[in-house]
Every structure is written in structure tokens, then in C-alpha cells.
Amino acid sequence: MPVQYPDPDIVALDNRFRRYIIGNTVIKRLYTGTLWAEGPAWNGVGRYLVWSDIPNNVQMRWLEDDGHVSVFRNPSGYSNGNTFDYEGRQLSCEHGGRRVERYEPSGAVTVIADKYQGKRLNSPNDIVVHPDGGIWFTDPTYGIRGNYEAFKAEPEVKPAVYRADPKSGQLDKVFDDTDGPNGICFSPDYKKVYLADTGAARQIWVFDLDGKALRNGKRFIQLDIPGSGGMPTAADGIRCDIDGNIWAGARPGVQVITPNGERIGMIRMPETCANVCFGGSKRNRLFMAGSQSLYAVYVDTQGAHIA
């Protein structure tokens, strides 16, 4: 059944969000059939989106030119978050190998990080790259709590956020005052880092980025479900647009927060949205990994970063 214009599930909670709504576009389901969709990442050269189906141990790919969907990588090592570096190489957070890896043009795989101070990482979850070459990722225990998203195991290190230098091999822990580090992204000017915490804190943190270190960490926002009377929810994957707004996978789909920490809009979805990314040839299409499906909607802004 056709959806009316404007799509009633793209909701302005504040007039400031209306500028981002395109009146004659709708939320589209591009694919369905996964068990737990995660980690969407846009490849601008190939004009495709890659995302993870964690329990099925595969990565999927959607092509922009004809909408074709296929299995991209099987097995995937139970990958979760994905991104691309500034040389176009894919980076993946792998639950199965408890590591972050990079896929080379030759087909080889380079391990970016799998141990911290001699102990195995937990289950790297989400990942972003900085123009200085640094690779930032989160490492909660979600992927080793059972056998559904990889292999049940005891954690050897505390959940944390890390920065890896792929040239030197140096791995630095930058934050560990959390039991559930999850989504991560930079502000458009790379002066701030946002961290979605799905642990006990159930909040988004914001930090000042000081070279390779995080400073002045504080609560950015604690989300609830709009219209629920205050029922709490938590952001999972997060991305920033060129105006500094945070687009967060959070019930009832996606919530949009200003750089000042004010929620202004939401996108309602029929499935739980785990993660998002901007893509398309103009970076003005929001892709949403929603449980069993991949969704997309055009918005009147652009993603701040390449993937």
C-alpha cells in the first residue's frame, strides 16, 4: 500500500527538524531476511552499502545502481560494525575473532587490534576513522555473552573505547568508565567524540578530542521513547550530519539530537534500529539497519564523514 506524502513516520518533535524533512520521499525497505542487521557502512567508490548480519555470520551488500542485494562476505567472523578508511579499505569489528581487521585490495586481512596488554579484546562493536589515520572503536562484552552472535567466553579486559594506530601498531585505551560502550562518532570538525552507552548509564556521552585523548567527558543526552510518558531507551549506533546533529538508532527507530543535546525529531520504524549511516552519491540518504531488514530514507542534510 503506498505511503502518503509527507511520510507520517518522519516526525518533527521541534520545528528545527522540519528543514531536514523532504516532503515527497518515504522510508523504503531495501531488503529483509537477516536475523540481526548491524554495522551499515557506505563505500563511495563502489557506490554500495555493506552491512552485517551477525548471527548468520555474513556481510551483505546493496548496490546503488540497481538495488541488487547479495551476500558480500561469508563467513564474516560474526562481524558487527563496519567502516571504510581514507584509502577505501573496509574495516570490520569481528565478534568471532574478538578483533578489528582491515580487508586489503589484495584480499589479505590485516589484524588492527586483537589484544590489549596481552589480553584478548571482548567483542569489538562499532568503529570510526579519523583523518590522522587513527582507528577508534568500542569493545563491550555483548558478542561473547552467548553463542548467538559468536562464541560464549569470559571477558579478559574491561569494556572500553580504544584508539589504534595502524602504522605503529599502538593500541591505546581512551575511556573505560562504562560497562556498555556501543556506537561512536566524531563531530563534523573532529573536535568532539560522541559515545553511545547501552550499559547501566543508558546515555550518550560527549568528549572533547585532544589529540589522541578524550577530555571533559559528560552526559550529552539520556533518551526516552517520545510519547511514552518517559519510558527509557538507549542509543545504539550513531552518526553525525554536517550540521552537527546526531542521528541515533533508538526506539521507536531513529532519534535526532542537536549539537546542544536537544531531541528534535524521530523516524518511526516497524523494527528495532540498531545502527545507521549516511550514504548515496550525495551522502543525503540515511540507511538504517533494523533487525531483519535494511531501510533507507532521503533527508535534507548530508553525512559529515565518508562512511
Feature locations, PLM:
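A detector of repeated loop/turn-to-beta-strand junctions in beta-rich toroidal repeat architectures
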Residues: 56, 97, 151, 155-159, ...
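Blade-edge beta-strand/turn elements of extracellular beta-propeller
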Residues: 15-32, 67-75, 103-118, 160-180, ...
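Beta-propeller domains
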Residues: 19, 44-74
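Beta-rich, blade/repeat-based domains predominating
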Residues: 26, 32-47, 75-94, 99, ...
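Blade/loop signatures of beta-propeller domains
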Residues: 1-26, 305-307
